């Protein structure tokens, strides 16, 4: 997860089993259009990590989402999740709140127009909430899950 295009090219050049999904940070402030185009060209899809911008109030309180929420009778979070779906992202939002979990399923009785999708596309700032470092990647690579203990 969280690989960039260059890292994915390297993986594809040496892997025996091709990945089909890349989990990466995606939300209206960080849309990764170039990476997603590369994934599509290579038969892969993106799964959105931090689909609601890590709960950033600035994103959730964007006037456009309030306006669209009012139009469709939805919350800003539901509008953002609908954008993900229409933009081709796999989206699995997390919540411990039963009301939010139910609301996360209530996305299929409306669709954003092309113009609305374009307005959201214009919000892209290439702003990440998570940045990995070489040290972190090394730690992840060295992690050995306790598979034998799980038997």
Task: Identify the residue ranges that each predicted region occupies.
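Beta/alpha (TIM)-barrel catalytic core signal, keyed to glycine-rich beta->alpha loops juxtaposed to Asp/Glu
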Residues: 1-151
